[in-house]
Amino acid sequence: MKAVVYAGTRNLYPHMVMAMKSLLINSPVDKIYLIIEDDEFPFPVPDCIETIRVDPYLFFDPHSPNMGIQFTPFALIRAATAKLLPDDLDRVLQLDVDTIVEDSLNELWEMDLTGKYFAAVPEYLGKFKPYGPIYFNCGVMMLNLNEIRKTGIETDLIKFLNTEYVPYGDQDAWNKLGIDKAAIMPVRFNEAFCTGYTENPAIVHYAGRIDWASNPSVYRAKYLQKYRGAGWP
């Protein structure tokens, strides 16, 4: 089954709608899971979209060092994705809400992730590589849920984020603890200012620039004009 998961707080719900529309228009999937803080999603959505209500403090102490970071608590919750999704789901594509899908993602479900926790695109911009020679951007991740559950690494990720401050939430946890079992994803599946640019991006990632209305990038027009007024396929 082709499944995708997004996570976010209430202020991000409108961006989730745009992200999901772009996904279903350009690369239809069987199921979309929304990890959110409400019982129901407040916008009309297709039947393939299922909400999972999660208390932001389910896995993380409100006084943990990462609760005051620049991102919402759901940037930590994503470290526990494998604990929240159905046990019979063997892999899932985890997407940030500030992503727009522009082309088919079928290649990602065909990736061989045997023995790997995830596949993602490395960052190339800057010298921020605190955990080794490579640093992955985790805004687009194909998660191998079978391997994650088998090893129990999600428990280690949660413990790490509850005890050690990191600037980028679950992304730092994965780069610290899971990098030895990571596969490299082609850059066209996570085109961002920190990963690189291609002529035919499949996923455009704003990478934190969530104020799209004031973002002067060329991709702002795609969001505003193409998906804001688009209907569900």
Regions found by a protein language model. Name each.
Residues 1-8, 18, 138, 143-233:
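A glycosyltransferase accessory/donor-loop signature
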Residues 22-29:
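Short, acidic, metal-binding catalytic loop of nucleotide-sugar glycosyltransferases
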Residues 2-12, 62-67:
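Glycine-rich phosphate-binding "P-loop"
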Residues 41-84:
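Active-site-proximal specificity loops/subdomain of glycosyltransferases
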Residues 118-135, 216-220, 230-233:
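A short, conserved beta-to-alpha structural element at the edge of catalytic cores
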